[in-house]
Design a protein with these regions (language model features):
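Enzymes that bind and transform nitrogen-containing heteroaromatic metabolites
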Residues: 1-194
Length: 194
């Protein structure tokens, strides 16, 4: 998840800025190659509707677009071929190796997929990540912090249902890295996830 230094993901709801991200996000070639490597290692991607609709149709088309740099064409191939689960109450169809999970039992279906998965599952979408965290289904957080302070906006997590979480939620740092563009990456394990 791309976040500002003050842990906002958007200045205003829906302020995604397209595939390049909003103007405060610094995604250069080095960072994009990092995204590619991490996405390539995923056995599955779980995406909310908003994220899925930002990705499709750009990334499938990017695979063969010679006007784009190779790292973008590479991500297009990764995104298009990796198995995906689209979590949506409104979508009835999805292409590019995606199936749809939705409705009142979506979290239970995702829990079953997690138990059966052979490898890491990436999650895209703040609302979805919040719901999975509250349901104790996220075992790691991967944050790319961009050197910008937004001052206000949509926070990293929507209001968390107190649920079954023993607050405060404790995290353990697993990995961190700094990039030349000023972005830092922190990967945390979520303590106590079953």
């Amino acid at each position: 998840m791309n976040v500002s230094l003050d842990l906002f993901i958007e200045r205003e709801p829906g302020d995604h800025g397209g595939l390049g991200g909003p103007d405060w996000v610094r995604i250069d070639e080095s960072l994009h190659r990092e995204f590619n490597a991490r996405a390539r290692a995923m056995s599955m991607m779980v995406e909310g509707r908003t994220v899925y609709e930002m990705m499709d149709p750009f990334w499938p088309n990017a695979r063969g677009d010679s006007s784009l740099p190779d790292f973008m064409r590479e991500f297009g191939e990764i995104w298009t071929t990796t198995p995906k689960v689209l979590v949506s109450r409104t979508r009835t169809t999805a292409g590019h190796n995606a199936r749809i999970v939705g409705g009142d039992d979506a979290i239970a279906e995702l829990a079953a997929l997690r138990r059966e998965a052979d490898g890491d599952i990436g999650v895209g979408g703040a609302t979805l990540a919040t719901q999975l965290l509250a349901s104790q289904l996220l075992d790691e957080l991967l944050l790319f912090t961009h050197p910008a302070v937004l001052g206000a906006g949509r926070p990293l997590f929507d209001s968390l249902d107190r649920g079954e979480i023993d607050w405060p939620l404790q995290l353990d740092l697993l990995e961190h890295e700094s990039f030349d563009n000023g972005v830092t990456m922190h990967r945390y394990a979520v303590r106590g996830v079953r």
